[in-house]
């Protein structure tokens, strides 16, 4: 019930000198929501929720706190990204220029119909066309990371291809 209060307290402590603040998103059973884990690098989920704040570079829009001046400076999320990676692109755009943080004491419950990590190999066939946007958006997002981003994309897409071949419909 005090998630917003925790974000406002962090805002005051940081004197507005940050890009965004993010809450810890939990499932109704109290476990972390895998789809809403923040990233400490573009390639690695946040390892710990210890301490008053954890630096992060990407976050979900679930309980994301931004100052209006940040939105005015960086603009809005890319509208065409809607469905997948719009939040990661936007938060990464901001974190390239400003420090950003997860505030572990700020906790929200995010009930989702499907709380698993996105995986084309295990998803239902009626959702497969949506993955076009997932992969397109990832290319835009990770190419901004230079050579390492391209290598990440190649490795991730190769892994997804192997999963589809192993687990996809026969």
Feature-to-residue mapping (PLM):
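Alpha-helical elements of Rossmann-like donor-binding domains used by nucleotide-donor carbohydrate transfer enzymes
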Residues: 2, 6-9, 89-93, 137-140, ...
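Short aromatic-enriched loop/helix-cap "lid" or pocket-rim segments at secondary-structure transitions
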Residues: 31-37, 113-116
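Active-site donor/metal-binding and catalytic loop motifs
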Residues: 103-123
